[in-house]
């Protein structure tokens, strides 16, 4: 294998010799799970063609293998541009590469064969999700959803035919589209600025497909439509938007729908704006997203979707225990009689048809045609009846509102740790309030809620329901009642004679449907109290509608600008208005827990939590009264949040040439640009200021640090790989070519005039400088003992007792000093010459005869250019240089005045971890901010 040329693109991998790549010992390979069909095993290193392998064994055979060698042709970029993460961060779940990059791998292989004059192989069939011999776990899991699979089977023969209605005309673009659904982060109301334009999620998906298309075909002409004045980009975006609407319909029933497609922002019932916002600390920054960063740079992202993680989200469908079937809330009476098309109450008083419009259903029917859904009861008013389904959402949309309006309900809520433990669903009921809620005597409020049991194993269980409800103070009928209503009751069959006891025979026969007890008594008082707070604005608009007055469209159009200017005044007036019954109904919070118990067991298991959200038909939109139809809409809820950092950091797989470790760009904010990578690489490999060979620091990898790295340019490790916890800011002299000695090894004492690495464990206050180390003391020595570490292993400490988890402890049990670079003092040549004699005395006082095991500091003083190394590799440190060891210093004018505040103890009041002398670093470390991976809520226990 020959070395590659220096002009390598971002899409063409850089060949790496076998001696330059770490090849771990081959693990056990289960060919029954790792390879299918007639696929051959990858070549070993002994053959000269190294293919790195990482086979991960799990108890389940669904996701069992991971071939890291297949990533090299697609994801591997030059080593100096793709730093890998250290083992301090747990690697992601093993997964195989995305199928959307198979076309790129074949394209790269063709380019490589042309470069090396290798004859092309036989043409291959385009990689599709139904390709034989391809492992199931290497395919996007969305292809296996039954509804979408049927759609793709119907469209498969049209994809490659231009005039037959194909969506993309290339099958690889469909793979890229399906992958982009998993790759693109959820943005909410935010936009990503790229190329001077704000991009939403659909626009970013279009850009992703464009990048794949250019890498595959060389241009975007495939999106051009004849006889269209739109640009290619506009055509592609319209095509993506239309295809997105078609694909979304196949996944509407998923519990994880909101992880794939952003849920529609719905207004909070009864208010003008939605409270479903996300705080900034809950979201992952766009600057640290590798997908968006790659699109902004016009290249194919190095990351791919985590198929195993999304497969686990899709597997939530198998844990559905119940499904809503019927929700009806109505008022009926058995004492109302209908004679001669007139309804009479128990006292033979006629009822007003205008107050009870539902009586009209009985007036126009006779004999056996009369409604009999309620038996002998007559329907007087219907609050809600229709049932519809909406797409899934996060449970935070409910709990965040409760945290503000119903803190007692929020405190009593016990959410599950995982979505597999308990089913969460929401019932959003829009009720039609009665005009005066004065019903005849003998009327009853009925809440009929029925759910179907989807798990056959649960149909023979005993069931019970725990209901909790809170209401605002305005709807309280009795001041002495508790703030929260709580009730626990068993769920029995209709007509069960022993409903007060749990030992009835309801569970002896399997039940496919169960009736959820509804707190009708509580809601009867709530609905009766709500009508006492009239809604004047909606009533006025309803009267105008009944009079047949239509709004003047021309007048409204001419006053639109004035209306927009008055929005702020309308908002202020809207907030000062009196609360209405609709506003109070929206503040009612209720949830019900469904528990089941096996017939031969006494252990109750929580199967589902039903969250109730109530609103009325009188709602607001942009401070204007609007009307909504009555009905109930339900949807699935999840504990996991697609907007959280937990999800966005696990939705992607970060391939690397050295293993399954996550790259540093995933946890750095902002992500270093390409120019920053190149600058660091050139400073590392070509700058003389970074080249030295006299360091005695024991490290796992050879690190190029100013004056302390290993010599030569043979080391391919980048500057960023030297620091496992993030970037470290180089000193200002990193780009300067200093006339250093050949050895390049300087101890801590050499940097008196311009040292940018102050000591962390000084020799106490006995020296004139109050904290400078002895010439033989390392910057990372603790309690006089040498600690072998690297510059990147040291981080600033927040307090004297705080300990960074990424900071290795001292070998001798002493304190660990902190490195601080923020409060740098300015030293000029005069000050250096003035304190040179004091520094020599300080070196003699603090000399302890230890070995020089720390990293040297940076020196910017021109008078120290001819210094030699203060210590050798294996011997004891040399004494303070005298006589011929000192080179001639340049004559500099002495400062007549010395600033007394430079050595004021106030500047050294910030202590780090106690070192020798009880004092730590006085200055904070100046470095790039690194976001720490914070696990959020786990989804499965296997992570």
Swiss-Prot record:
Biased composition (Basic and acidic residues): 29-43, 537-555
GO terms for MF: DNA-binding transcription factor activity, RNA polymerase II-specific; RNA polymerase II cis-regulatory region sequence-specific DNA binding
GO CC annotations, alphabetized: nucleus; transcription regulator complex
Pfam family membership, one: TEA
Compositional bias of kind Low complexity: 865-889
Endpoints of the signal sequence: none
InterPro entries: TEA/ATTS_dom, TEA/ATTS_sf, TEC1_TEAD_TF
Keyword flag Transcription: yes
Keywords in alphabetical order: Activator, Conidiation, Nucleus, Sporulation, Transcription, Transcription regulation
Domain of life of the source: Eukaryota
Region: Disordered, residue numbers: 1-69, 111-133, 537-575, 809-901
GO process annotations (BP): conidium formation; sporulation resulting in formation of a cellular spore
Family: Belongs to the TEC1 family.
Protein name listed in UniProt: Conidiophore development regulator abaA
Organism (species): Hapsidospora chrysogena
């Amino acid at each position: 294998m020959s070395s590659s040329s220096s002009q390598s693109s971002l899409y063409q991998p850089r060949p790496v010799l076998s001696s330059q790549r770490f090849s771990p010992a081959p693990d056990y390979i289960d060919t029954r799970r790792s390879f299918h069909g007639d696929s051959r095993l990858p070549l070993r290193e002994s053959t000269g063609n190294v293919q790195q392998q990482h086979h991960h064994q799990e108890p389940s055979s669904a996701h069992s293998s991971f071939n890291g060698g297949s990533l090299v042709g697609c994801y591997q970029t030059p080593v100096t541009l793709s730093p890998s993460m250290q083992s301090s961060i747990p690697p992601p779940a093993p997964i195989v590469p995305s199928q959307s990059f198979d076309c790129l791998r074949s394209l790269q292989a063709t380019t490589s064969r042309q470069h090396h004059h290798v004859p092309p192989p036989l043409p291959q069939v385009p990689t599709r999700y139904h390709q034989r011999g391809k492992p199931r776990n290497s395919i996007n899991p969305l292809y296996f959803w039954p509804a979408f699979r049927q759609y793709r089977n119907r469209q498969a023969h049209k994809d490659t035919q231009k005039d037959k209605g194909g969506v993309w005309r290339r099958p690889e673009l469909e793979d890229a589209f399906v992958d982009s659904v998993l790759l693109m982060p959820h943005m909410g109301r935010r936009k990503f600025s790229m190329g001077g334009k704000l991009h939403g999620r659909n626009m970013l998906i279009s850009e992703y497909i464009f990048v794949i298309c250019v890498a595959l075909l060389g241009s975007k002409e495939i999106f051009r439509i004849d006889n269209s004045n739109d640009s290619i980009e506009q055509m592609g975006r319209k095509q993506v938007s239309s295809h997105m609407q078609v694909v979304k319909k196949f996944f509407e029933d998923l519990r994880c729908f909101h992880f794939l497609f952003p849920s529609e922002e719905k207004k909070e019932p009864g208010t003008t704006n939605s409270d479903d916002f996300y705080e900034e600390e809950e979201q992952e920054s766009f600057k640290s997203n590798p997908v968006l960063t790659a699109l902004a740079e016009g290249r194919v992202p190095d990351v791919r979707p985590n198929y195993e993680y999304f497969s686990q989200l899709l597997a939530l469908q198998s844990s559905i225990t119940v499904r809503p079937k019927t929700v009806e809330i109505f008022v009926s009476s058995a004492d109302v009689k209908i004679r001669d098309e007139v309804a009479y109450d128990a006292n033979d008083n006629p009822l007003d048809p205008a107050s009870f419009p539902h009586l009209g259903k009985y007036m126009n029917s006779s004999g056996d045609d009369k409604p009999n859904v309620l038996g002998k009861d007559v329907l007087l008013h219907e609050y809600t009846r229709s049932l519809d389904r909406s797409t899934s959402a996060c449970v935070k949309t409910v709990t965040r509102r409760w945290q503000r309006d119903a803190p007692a309900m929020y405190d009593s809520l016990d959410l599950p740790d995982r979505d597999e433990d308990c089913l969460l669903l929401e019932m959003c009921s829009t009720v039609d309030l009665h005009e005066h809620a004065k019903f005849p005597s003998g009327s009853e409020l009925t809440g009929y809620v029925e759910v179907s049991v989807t798990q056959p194993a649960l149909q023979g269980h005993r069931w019970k329901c725990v209901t909790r409800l809170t209401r605002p103070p305005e709807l309280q009928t009795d001041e002495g009642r508790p703030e929260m209503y709580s009730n626990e009751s068993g769920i029995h069959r209709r007509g069960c004679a022993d409903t007060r006891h749990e030992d009835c025979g309801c569970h002896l026969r399997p039940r496919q449907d169960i009736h959820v007890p509804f707190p009708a008594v509580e809601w009867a008082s709530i609905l009766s109290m709500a009508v006492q707070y009239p809604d004047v604005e909606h009533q006025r608009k309803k009267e105008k509608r009944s009079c047949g007055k239509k709004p003047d469209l021309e007048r409204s159009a001419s006053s639109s600008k004035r209306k927009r200017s008055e929005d702020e005044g309308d908002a202020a007036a809207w907030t000062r208005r009196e609360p209405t019954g609709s506003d109070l109904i929206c503040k009612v919070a209720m949830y019900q827990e469904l528990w089941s118990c096996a017939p031969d067991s006494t252990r109750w298991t929580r199967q589902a939590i039903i969250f109730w959200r109530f609103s009325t038909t009188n709602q607001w939109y942009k401070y204007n009264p609007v009307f909504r139809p009555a009905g109930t809409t339900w949807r699935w809820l999840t504990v996991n949040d697609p907007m959280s950092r937990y999800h966005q950091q696990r939705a992607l797989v970060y391939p690397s040439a050295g293993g399954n470790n996550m790259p540093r760009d995933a946890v750095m904010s902002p992500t270093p640009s390409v120019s920053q990578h190149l600058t660091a690489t050139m400073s590392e490999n070509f700058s003389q200021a970074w080249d030295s060979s006299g360091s005695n620091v024991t490290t796992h990898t050879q690190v190029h640090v100013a004056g302390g790295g290993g010599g030569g340019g043979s080391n391919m490790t980048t500057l960023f790989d030297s620091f496992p916890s993030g970037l470290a800011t180089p000193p200002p002299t990193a780009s300067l070519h200093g006339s250093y000695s050949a050895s390049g090894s300087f101890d801590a004492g050499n940097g008196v005039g311009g040292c940018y690495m102050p000591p962390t464990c000084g020799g106490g206050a006995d020296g004139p400088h109050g904290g400078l180390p002895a010439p033989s003391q390392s910057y990372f020595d603790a309690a006089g003992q040498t600690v072998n570490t690297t510059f990147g292993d040291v981080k600033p400490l927040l307090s004297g007792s705080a300990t960074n988890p990424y900071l290795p402890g001292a070998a001798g049990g002493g304190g660990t000093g902190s490195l601080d670079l923020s409060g740098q003092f300015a030293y000029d040549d005069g000050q250096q010459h003035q304190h040179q004699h004091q520094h020599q005395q300080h070196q003699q006082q603090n000399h302890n005869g230890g070995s020089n095991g720390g990293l040297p500091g940076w020196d910017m003083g021109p008078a120290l250019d001819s210094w030699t190394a203060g210590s050798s590799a294996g011997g004891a440190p040399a004494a303070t240089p005298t006589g011929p060891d000192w080179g001639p210093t340049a004559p500099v004018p002495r400062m007549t005045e010395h600033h007394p505040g430079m050595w004021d103890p106030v500047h050294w009041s910030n202590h780090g971890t106690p070192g020798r002398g009880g004092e730590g670093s006085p200055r904070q470390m100046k470095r790039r901010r690194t976001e720490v991976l914070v696990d959020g809520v786990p989804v499965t226990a296997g992570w």
